[in-house]
Amino acid sequence: MKYDVLVIAGTTESRQVIEKLLRANPKERILASVATELGKEMLLEYGIDIHVGRLDYDGFLTLFEENPCRKIIDASHPFA
């Protein structure tokens, strides 16, 4: 599937970003990437697709190749 936005999530701010995106365009196709199942649980209410798992450089490349997106928003922890 082609997504409008990939949100690299991991902070409270990532939830705020997703909320704003959906408020602006409820039909926005969003994929969120989180490191843990807990992160996934925190985003389930938004009805978006969620990738779970820690990603290194190659993991991100694979994610991008398998899930094309028009925009990427990095809302991960600033020290991660």
Where are these regions (language model features)?
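Extreme N-terminal starter segment of soluble prokaryotic enzymes
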Residues: 1-5
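Conserved N-terminal Rossmann-fold NAD(P)-binding element of oxidoreductases
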Residues: 7-9
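Short glycine/serine/threonine-rich phosphate/pyrophosphate-binding segments
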Residues: 12-17, 80
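Short, charged/polar "capping" segments at the starts of alpha-helices
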Residues: 14, 38-43
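A short, Lys/Arg-enriched amphipathic alpha-helix followed by its capping loop at the start of a domain
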Residues: 17-28
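Short internal beta-strands
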Residues: 29-37
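Glycine-rich, highly charged phosphate/nucleotide-binding loops
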Residues: 46-65
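N-terminal glycine-rich phosphate/adenylate-binding segment common to multiple enzyme folds
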Residues: 61-80
